[in-house]
Curated annotation (Swiss-Prot), chains A, B:
This is Putative thymidine phosphorylase 2. Pfam families: Glycos_trans_3N, Glycos_transf_3, PYNP_C. It comes from the Bacteria. It catalyses: thymidine + phosphate = 2-deoxy-alpha-D-ribose 1-phosphate + thymine. Belongs to the thymidine/pyrimidine-nucleoside phosphorylase family. Type 2 subfamily. InterPro entries: Glycosyl_Trfase_fam3 (IPR000312), Glycosyl_Trfase_fam3_N_dom (IPR017459), Glycosyl_Trfase_fam3_N_dom_sf (IPR036320), Nuc_phospho_transferase (IPR035902), PYNP-like_C_sf (IPR036566), PYNP_C (IPR013102), Pyrmidine_PPase_CS (IPR017872), Thym_Pase_Put (IPR028579). One of its GO terms (cellular component) is cytosol. Keywords: Glycosyltransferase, Transferase. One of its GO terms (molecular function) is thymidine phosphorylase activity.
Amino acid sequence: MTAQMHEAGRTKEAGNRLQAWRTGIDTYQEPVVYMRRDCPVCRSEGFTTQARVQLTAGGRSIVATLSVVDGDWLAENVAGLSESAWASLGAQPGEPVAVTHAPPLDSLSHVRAKVYGNSLGDAQFGAIISDVAAGRYSDLHLATFITACAGDRLDLAETLSLTKAMIAVGDRIDWGRPLVVDKHCVGGLPGNRTTLLVVPIVTACGLMMPKTSSRAITSPAGTADTMEVLAPVNLDVPSMRRVVERTGGCIVWGGSVRLSPADDILIRVERPLDLDSEGQLVASVLSKKAAAGSTHVLIDLPVGATAKVRSAHAAASLGRRLQEVGGAIGLQVFLRVTDGEQPVGRGIGPALEARDVLAVLQGTREAPADLRERALRLAADILEMGGAAPAGGGLKLATEVLADGRAWAKFQAICSEQGGLRSLPMAAHLHTVESPGTGRVTRIDNRLLARAAKLAGAPTAPAAGIDVHARLGDRVEAGQPLFTLHAQAPGELAYALEFVRARPPIFQISENV
Amino acid sequence: MTAQMHEAGRTKEAGNRLQAWRTGIDTYQEPVVYMRRDCPVCRSEGFTTQARVQLTAGGRSIVATLSVVDGDWLAENVAGLSESAWASLGAQPGEPVAVTHAPPLDSLSHVRAKVYGNSLGDAQFGAIISDVAAGRYSDLHLATFITACAGDRLDLAETLSLTKAMIAVGDRIDWGRPLVVDKHCVGGLPGNRTTLLVVPIVTACGLMMPKTSSRAITSPAGTADTMEVLAPVNLDVPSMRRVVERTGGCIVWGGSVRLSPADDILIRVERPLDLDSEGQLVASVLSKKAAAGSTHVLIDLPVGATAKVRSAHAAASLGRRLQEVGGAIGLQVFLRVTDGEQPVGRGIGPALEARDVLAVLQGTREAPADLRERALRLAADILEMGGAAPAGGGLKLATEVLADGRAWAKFQAICSEQGGLRSLPMAAHLHTVESPGTGRVTRIDNRLLARAAKLAGAPTAPAAGIDVHARLGDRVEAGQPLFTLHAQAPGELAYALEFVRARPPIFQISENV
């Protein structure tokens, strides 16, 4: 060791401490640290912007991306933390923070190999997912990994490796029962909020269904977003366990129970990129089901020209992949292919979808028949798969339980255990788009509809979204309402409307049909 | 239009103005705007973190990524701009800034199509590159595009479309001459700094060679980084033109002449990701050569097990692609495959490489013979391809011009015109790694060597890098120096040394050879 190395060693011990300071900057989920260019740490360590640094305070370490600052608002002796860095480091204001180079990320070489078209195995996916779950990947690294696995770039063996790696970094709930049912919808269909109906129906029939749901990734509302309008969903595992023990079921946000820490991190980049991947979808869904302690899982696969799954062929291929990987990790996977040609129910967006759900549960005149029928079909499958109804007898039982109010009572009990049933918020800014001509509705573009609902503010603004007034095959007159945009802020209403006006018509009205 | 829409229109006119404020936050090149969560714009427009927003001041507009802030250091009525947002918006402190939703980025659907494995055509690449050049892509979008095109995912037609799209968004210099020569090295070989020798040799023989070079993307030094140690390289087009008119050549940074605005933006994400793509490499190189007004281009393709091009087969494939695309856009492309088994010269890193270049130009005893020979070979090719020497006579002419001092005089003239020859900086913190045993050097891992040089601070710290003391085939004794790490900061020296110690040996010493 040379004289310089001894000096370097000393620097490492003493010279690299700053004081923790909360900047209040929301960088979404990527941890960022702000340090003055002329602070002692940047000078001695040679740090520049975009460097990945390790922050250590009170024995806890995180990796963050550095932004160097020239500006008096940041003191020379502080490490300014973004909100996510502040939360994950858990430091006290003014507490000493040691700042060092982040350890080299060797698993990135596997990501690079995947980008270049090579196949990865258990060890490589294990290394990548373990680094992802530990927060060692920057958003750029995550974007590269997700893109490299997107489309159909993961084969069966790779999808299984990824699934196992994602299960390995999380916890797994043991319910002490031989049969725990679950469902998942592959999505892409606005308003398809059947979970909020299926869970109360099947738990009212004695099955156990501890449902963890996701927030929206690329859609205007995830099931967790919609449920949150009606009851708290940010439960931890002990609270979730209490709700399930008392009611047989729950509908909580999977991110708060943190059963799939890697998945929660990947989702933060999938959302702004609006990318899906078959392999990642399978790994994400099945690792969460395994972690939640499920044994029997029904997968709803809506198929339609503008849904996520666009053909019966694609549904069969995805379904087979789900069953193969499920079998390899000890999950029995059942499939139900459903019609995905148009939105389900009337509302798109958290509050508008929740309103439809309540109407079905309460059997009111406004209850959308399609949402009710889809939920009954899926509940019937689960009742039969779980042995609560004889083969072919599921639909009759599900229909009775919904009609006689047992499902509504069960839903209220679940909401109450999760923290209390809430009343629905309403949007203040509305605009109705009318039919330009007279004719029949021959096509509805789900993707444009979902994008317009997102531009109107959904799901961040829970009352925002779209109310759909016409369905496929309906006859409409010129000037008749097709759909209404709901927004909580005037700027968002204007933005969504501008989008709708600039695109091809979302509803195709044909005169001679 | 409803009452709400009129209200939205009014808000858009008046309510969305904040005052420009320079935060001094360096976010590398991504423009970021910091706004208080409770500011009037966030409240009226419903903006949340990660939103892409359009900022307009004095008729100039940019798109930036929003970070929402809860914190008193940022005033309620300001739009806090990152350094890159501040520079590109060009606002005055306190100037009103209008903040609106960024227009929807329709070209992202093409990126998504490419991610899912579809081929893109002229129109799609044109739309993507035009949005990239206009700064409408976030770093996450750029990472997705780059990953989707990485490896060999672009076919010939797509590579040509991308090249044409990149040329279309930039300027093209017209030198008014039928023959303008250029060279490019595909890279991956530390220390291969032949450009600084080739330009003075061939311009001393009367050819015109206006060389724009890049900064390091994934290497410890780019040609522009090395040249910058010796003379200013941040010239604009008129200054570059003046240098070339007076001396016949130049060596400037391509990013400052801004001939390839899209390429300059893509590189900002390629660097942290350490990703290369054949299609993007071809498009990047050839679009820059076309923009610089070159007509005849020599491509140096170093081949070696740990170089960027690893086999003669890969070199032939890449070379063919460069010639095909070059031909289609009117560039004559010549190839020279060179040995890429070990670093060139002794130094790795801007200042250490510049020192080697000066030794060759001045013919001193320390001049690395391999660097000298490689440069003479390439200069000879260019002299013949440009008609300054008869076929087979290039090497003799190049050798004479270097030996008699004309090349050194020309290099000084070019440096002087670019702003003056500078003296070399030296690193303060050194550590020499010695051979663990006695034997012959049978393998040198260029990739690990380059990574260690980067961890030591190169190229951001110009004096940082590695001095290599042994070459392939050399016999070394135990304890004999193999290489010396140079760093400007003690932390960086420690970090690089830690890396070297944790990896397999960079130099393989075999006893029985």
